[in-house]
Amino acid sequence: MVVVKKAIPIIQAYEFLDMEIIQTPLMGRSVEQQVVGQATRDGDGVKLTRVLTQTHQRRLDPFLMLDHFGSDNPNDYGGGFPDHPHRGFETVTYMISGRMRHKDSAGNEGLLQNGGVQWMTAGRGVVHSEMPEQEEGLMEGFQLWLNLPSHQKMCKPAYLDIQSDRIPETWPHESVKVRVIAGESNSTLGAVHRSPSLFPTQTLYLDIHFQKQSSFEQALNPKHNAFLFVYRGSVSVVSEKETTAIELNRMAILRNEGNGVLIRGSPGAKVLLISGQALNEPIAQYGPFVMNTREELMQAVDDFRAGLFKS
């Protein structure tokens, strides 16, 4: 039985994703590498784990970074992320638990709460803050940095505030729930689905919950880079070659050799599955600026110092 939770459309006049239809049988990808994140602090002392670092940017193009923050100690998150700039990419913040307010120089404001997503396109430049609206309790979530193609890096900044009840959920069977943040799973379109002619990365972003020990299959475009991150319990990735166990708080990079992935989850396991089309463009990064050349980075710094991100 397939149960689908309908979502209110949040992006109008976009084409459906031009994804390749995966034929059966599914050829599951195997695990190329497992990665343990780096503990660090960012913003005003927020404790987090940097799961996807610059080391893996080229391999996991178009994805630039994935941070996982999670603590019930206010000292670990109370300072939040005061005003800071971005140019040339998108940030996707997914809140598992807690309350955080977003404000930016384009005049956008939103409250990110349990299960919600904020999808911000920095484009030509934006200054924003992300500050906790709680003084105690658990705050947990993820922030993904998604690169923009060269022709979109100087686009107008944009912002989507997606509440939890606007994210479609599908149950491939009674033991597995999938929250479809972006892309498509089990014939269910995600909260974000955009024209590939404008946004060629064709991002897939799933949050998969295993209620019992069970399996889940997801079609993947054979041309796309893909990885998963286990944030509860443990899972195994099953392919014709091998079965690989992925423990808690590990990222698994999937080989580009199949048209899907088969995941077996332990009871209560939760995993993010993310994939996208590589841009195959030069990556030049200086902190919160991601462009294609050093000259463009220098211009970004000059523009920020000149106050041009404020408009």
What are the residue ranges of the model-derived segments?
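Jelly-roll (double-stranded beta-helix
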Residues: 2-311
